[in-house]
A protein has these predicted regions:
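Conserved nucleotide-sugar phosphate-binding/catalytic loop shared by glycosyltransferases and other
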Residues: 34-79, 158
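Active-site-proximal region of nucleotide-activated glycan assembly enzymes
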Residues: 128-211
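Conserved nucleotide-sugar donor-interacting segment of glycosyltransferase catalytic cores
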Residues: 85-158, 211
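N-terminal subdomain of nucleotide-sugar transferases
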Residues: 1-52
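Short, acidic/turn-prone active-site loops that include or flank metal/cofactor-
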Residues: 10-12, 55-60, 131-136
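A short helix->loop->beta-strand "cap" motif at the edges of active sites that frequently abuts
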Residues: 49, 123-126, 202-203
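Structural motif
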Residues: 3, 105-106, 204
Length: 211
């Protein structure tokens, strides 16, 4: 039987949006395994999935970097990015252990599990990058992620987006990309230059939205 291994970051809102996909795979006869929060393991098992908890050390890291306490968008993004980078040191090895236990044919990895994404990219199985929210990829005419700016599709708006993008999300990237590449290099992966590179490294990306 074809086996699937799904790995989420330590947040309820990251397993729930993934469940319709996992249940559909199970309905089609696949053996679906999940690694998620310990508080969600019983629910996943009740739904007919094989489930185990992720490394218990991952969840407390969020308490060290509360993005809600930030005073501006840039600071909030920096806190979140720092949290993901710290967790990556743990979720990468945790995911690798899960792969060794399950020996899956297909991997599904949460967008916020940066270490697990590196592990997935470095191995040879097919894999999916899963995001429970719209991914902040750059695109022409779209305001930069973070400040909540309205779309302003004219020359002045494009200048605004370029400047604000460098000051906010661009600044966060410059501080965090070296930490991501520090995980990638030992895995034999080429360095990334942006968050876009990290997301688009996957052979397939699934994005949930409210529309």
């Amino acid at each position: 039987m074809t086996a699937v291994l799904a790995y989420t970051s330590p947040a309820m809102g990251h397993l729930y949006p993934m469940m319709p996909l996992l249940l559909e795979l199970r309905a089609r006869g696949l053996d679906v395994h999940v690694r998620s929060l310990d508080t969600l393991v019983d629910q996943a098992r009740a739904a007919g999935l094989s489930a185990e908890r992720i490394d218990a050390r991952l969840r407390p890291i969020a308490d060290k970097h509360p993005d809600w306490a930030a005073t501006n968008a840039k600071a909030a993004l920096e806190r979140s990015a720092t949290m993901f980078a710290e967790r990556a040191v743990l979720d990468g090895p945790d995911f690798r252990r899960a792969i060794e236990e399950v020996d899956p044919d297909l991997l599904i990895v949460d967008t916020n599990a940066w270490g697990a994404l590196v592990v997935a990219e470095a191995q040879r199985r097919p894999w999916l990058h899963f995001s429970p929210y719209l991914v902040p990829l750059r695109s022409t005419g779209t305001p930069p992620f973070g400040p909540g700016l309205p779309r302003w599709d004219n020359p002045v708006g494009r200048v605004r987006d370029a400047v604000v993008g460098r000051l906010v999300f661009g600044a966060v990237e410059r501080s965090i990309i070296p930490r991501i590449n520090a995980l990638r290099t030992p895995a034999g992966l080429a360095p990334v230059r942006s968050f876009d590179d990290l997301v688009l490294a996957a052979p397939l990306v699934a994005i949930c939205s409210a529309t």
